[in-house]
Amino acid sequence: MFKLALTLTLCLAGSLSLAQHNPHWWGNRNTIVHLFEWKWSDIAQECESFLGPRGFAGVQVSPVNENIIAAGRPWWERYQPISYKLTTRSGNEEEFGDMVRRCNDVGVRIYVDVLLNHMSGDFDGVVVGTAGTEAEPREKSFPGVPYTAQDFHPTCEITDWNDRFQVQQCELVGLKDLDQSSDWVRSKLIEFLDHLIELGVAGFRVDAAKHMASEDLEYIYSSLSNLNIDHGFPHNSRPFIFQEVIDHGHETVSRDEYKDLGAVTEFRFSEEIGNAFRGNNALKWLQSWGTGWGFLPSGQALTFVDNHDNQRDAGAVLNYKSPKQYKMATAFHLAYPYGISRVMSSFAFDDHDTPPPQDAQERIVSPEFDEDGACVNGWICEHRWRQIYAMVGFKNAVRDTEVTGWWDNGDNQISFCRGNKGFLAINNNLYDLSQDLNTCLPEGTYCDVISGSLIDGSCTGKSVTVNEYGFGYIHIGSDDFDGVLALHVDARV
């Protein structure tokens, strides 16, 4: 009997963790966008007017629970929680619930960035949060939950990143480190996440997951409610989990400890794709992209060119400030069948602490748009760049096909097909790509969705005529505005 019970327990745990890799997308949609620091009302409108019609699968939203108010309102104040009340600069609980409902109604899922590792760092005396709650972070007193000092690990600094104890039980940049092995802490975290599930979210990005023991997270995840069927989720659906685990391959705490609990953020993907498109590694080597580069299995990897943290760091990672290379890297990211894809939607920044666009009263301002639909007034909105949203459509059109017909020039010009549904070519050399290439597409004329769109039966940008053998003449000049060309069956004239 004991063996049978143990077997059933293990099977249940295994099935739950497998289910937590499912992002619950509608139809053929398969790209998440991180609308960093957007207000809930603006996200709701964006789901209805842009993301839904353009085929985006979901939105990662900024932390939803009450945080400290820091001088100047830097973005990182959202990562310093003081209670689980759903009031932030993005809006209140009613506005959040309205956003989730409206986005789900148009097939765009919501994934919340959640903070399970810690509460706010040191601030002297009593602080007041975004919902009006008082706390004394230095004393580890958070009555809005409530948490007291006994709910936290003893205060210590992380000085040795090769010491598992320090990484998982000391304070990450001074943030008060919760004890997730505590029954009380577990109950409050589960209560918080279950409330979000009740409101209709599809899952969670778990911040700082490597700083929590995987067995504690497994307990928390397995204790969560199923997703809310009133928001269109099938019965017994589990929340999608993707966990922030920074692992460069030599970490004491490994991504492998978390990959069976849910997807894991594949930071090596971000670093290597940046290296390649900055010219530090020839694009020809991308033919083996994915597990051949030491990355996680595709279904366990949350992939991205940049995120809200590493886009602010020096190094190989690309961001919106290198637009030509960034668009090429994003096109490759969305065209190559590896990982669970997320694209970034940023605001402009000059330094690490730059706050989101705000008014004189330090309230986040809504994005405004020009006549082409691009964002202005401090918002970058990469997801509204044609070269990026068109590749979201490309990724939808070619879903469930494999890479075929790889070609390269032995250097930084490459092309490949996605079955007989799509074709991508990239030129990252300082000379033109001019070549008859196998597009693998049926005979016909196709619009390049990077340089333009298919509107009323004609192309506003480049077009390529494909012959009966699937070949077409591909030209990408070294001085072209974009170094990439993309064709797919849904953009056939």
From Swiss-Prot:
Record-annotated disulphide pairs: 47-103, 156-170, 375-381, 417-440, 447-459
Matches recorded under SMART domains: Aamy, Aamy_C
Top-level taxon in the UniProt lineage: Eukaryota
Subunit description: Monomer.
Keyword Disulfide bond appears in the UniProt entry: yes
Signal peptide limits: 1-19
E.C. no: 3.2.1.1
Pfam families hit by this protein: Alpha-amylase (PF00128), Alpha-amylase_C (PF02806)
SUPFAM superfamilies tied to this protein: (Trans)glycosidases (SSF51445), Glycosyl hydrolase domain (SSF51011)
Requisite cofactors: Ca(2+); chloride
Family per similarity comment: Belongs to the glycosyl hydrolase 13 family.
Positions bearing the site annotation: Transition state stabilizer: 309
Active-site residues annotated for this sequence: 207, 244
Protein name: Alpha-amylase-related protein
Organism: Drosophila teissieri
Entry binding sites for Ca(2+): 117, 168, 177, 211
GO-annotated molecular function: alpha-amylase activity; metal ion binding
